Amino acid sequence: MSEVITQEYTEDGKVLRRIRSFVRREGRLTKGQEAAMKECWPTMGIDYQPELLDWQQVFGNDNPVVLEIGFGMGASLVEMAKNAPEKNFLGIEVHSPGVGACLASAREAGVTNLRVMCHDAVEVFAHMIPDNSLHTLQLFFPDPWHKKRHHKRRIVQLEFAEMVRQKLMIGSGVFHMATDWENYAEHMVEVMNQAPGFANLATDGDYVPRPDERPLTKFEQRGHRLGHGVWDIKYQRTA
């Protein structure tokens, strides 16, 4: 296992200090996940390296790129890729069993427009994602850090929003978030309303109806069972 370092923020979103946000635990891969990693990584896996990706080289075409941070076991990401062959998808997940499961599902579904990485997303963004190149960034059901004293650990902060803004296409790129914690949804809206260069795409209030392109995830199903709502939030890069 290896430690992943992220930032701690003040209330106004400025970096206070670098902290350990989580420890990357490799976990135990099932035989199927291990086989999928060995078989599919050469064609679908991208190793971390501190140089910018060339999307044409990665996918073999110039289709719009959708990037998802923290795809879990990858079921919804694979479904989205299968349902939208006209788009390219890149998923970033730090837990290798999830990456293995995603690759196994992708192989079974026969998708060819999906690539995956097993690395800290902040480092990937800083060193590998070209500016002004993403059609959509997806952040679905991130850790809510529901205790108030842990809110500063939430990934959606002003510095993160600025990092996202730089990578989205000007005038069209969309940052799509979803959470089943109302307080985190309110936090997301508060941060994004303060972040320069974004406009909320909701036509009624702060939230959009669940888009057809986002499959029903196990997290959302859990939320329904617990009586939680689910909030979808979309902001478009305007500048």
Swiss-Prot record:
Please indicate if the UniProt record lists tRNA processing as a keyword.
Answer: yes
Domain of life assignment: Bacteria
Q: Name one GO biological process term.
A: tRNA methylation
Which keywords appear in this protein's UniProt record, sorted alphabetically? Methyltransferase, S-adenosyl-L-methionine, Transferase, tRNA processing
**Which PROSITE patterns does the UniProt record give?**
SAM_MT_TRMB
Residue ranges annotated as coiled coil are none
Which Pfam families would you find in this protein's record?
Methyltransf_4
Positions contributing to substrate binding = 147, 180, 217-220
User: Which positions in this protein are listed as binding S-adenosyl-L-methionine?
Assistant: 68, 93, 120, 143
Provide the family line: Belongs to the class I-like SAM-binding methyltransferase superfamily. TrmB family.
Q: What is this protein's name?
A: tRNA (guanine-N(7)-)-methyltransferase
| Species name | Vibrio cholerae serotype O1 (strain ATCC 39315 / El Tor Inaba N16961)
Gene behind the chain: trmB
